[in-house]
Amino acid sequence: MLNLKVAKEQATIVVAMSGGVDSSTVAAILKEDGYNVIGITMQLYNHDTAINRKGACCAGQDIYDAKFVANQLQIPHYVLNYKDKFKESVIDNFIESYINGETPLPCVQCNQSVKFHDLLNFAKDLQADALVTGHYVRRIDTANGIELHKAVDSKKDQSYFLFATTKSQLQYLHFPLGNMTKDETRYHANRYGLHIADKPDSQDICFVADGAYHNVVAKLKPNAKKPGKIVHIDGYILGEHQGIINFTIGQRRRIGISFSDPLYVINIDAQQNIVYVGPESKLFKTTFMIHSLNWLGPGNMLVEPLDVEVKVRSTHSAVRAKLYPYSNSMVKVILNEPEKAIAPGQACVIYKGDLVLGGGWIAKEQTQS
């Protein structure tokens, strides 16, 4: 199943167990297949630091569920305290991103900094042969190296959130569920008699309740709510806001302005503490920059213009575009057709069909258009 260089009965596999059905089923499949499996669960945050809610990844109930499954499978299980690291690398960056007028993507930063860095290094310290997760994405060995591909189940594909995985990390990571559908995963979970077989999927941001991200920001950084101006993109002042952390690009509701036509958040100027609003038509654009490119395609970096498909939000479909190398790991992206609400701080993930070529972070515009 994992195509390792050692025989499965001699291989030690660390499974990142979140307490959900996906990672629990992976652990069960590998145990049944004859591997020596070790379950690891990360404790990521204090409930008094973030906003607690049910259905959150790596919360108290999830740790209990992971340990219960490990006992059922009769595999070793450890809980690692990564709360400080998670706060430093994910929550603090999440807060700063909103303060800077961006729309952050903490799940990618968690994969990038905690799961595939700290946890991966811990697995290596255990002299494990691989770190395995329950992500829906495919890792394919080819003559040209290891490739990352979209999952077979397009509805559950998580490749967008894994674009920052490096080539060296892919040498050690494996994703057995990439060739399964979610229904197949639940079937196997029931077959193994796992008590979490019908457990709902975790939500996107584990430490935010009901999408109220501004409550987390305000709780951990109370001075982040500074009043400022709401300005129409044509230049005139419409009113006052109570903090740019309450806004994101493309937002229509809860702007707090009465106007003859629907208003949307078009841009956020963090330096001037101004929220720019305007008609929906102003949300569409074809050209933007991405920074901190992680390249998974041929060679070490994008070196010439390339026709690709890109996703600018996890919920968006991939659209055709052309990449132009710029400088310092920056790339200009020109879309074939305009896309709506391209938000700084979100990821732009690059594809060629099902192949993940990498991605980067959408950069803020230098000037107000």
From Swiss-Prot:
The keyword Repeat appears for this protein: no
GO biological process, one term: tRNA wobble position uridine thiolation
Disulfide bond sites: C110-C206
Superkingdom, taxonomy of origin: Bacteria
GO MF terms, alphabetically ordered: ATP binding; tRNA binding; tRNA-uridine 2-sulfurtransferase activity
InterPro entries to which the protein is assigned, alphabetical: MnmA-like, MnmA-like_C, MnmA-like_central, MnmA-like_central_sf, Rossmann-like_a/b/a_fold
Cellular compartments annotated: Cytoplasm
One Gene Ontology cellular component: cytoplasm
Alphabetical UniProt keywords: ATP-binding, Cytoplasm, Disulfide bond, Nucleotide-binding, RNA-binding, Transferase, tRNA processing, tRNA-binding
Chain's role: Catalyzes the 2-thiolation of uridine at the wobble position (U34) of tRNA, leading to the formation of s(2)U34.
PANTHER family named in the record: MITOCHONDRIAL TRNA-SPECIFIC 2-THIOURIDYLASE 1, TRNA 5-METHYLAMINOMETHYL-2-THIOURIDYLATE -METHYLTRANSFERASE
Name this protein carries in UniProt: tRNA-specific 2-thiouridylase MnmA
Species annotation: Orientia tsutsugamushi (strain Boryong) (Rickettsia tsutsugamushi)
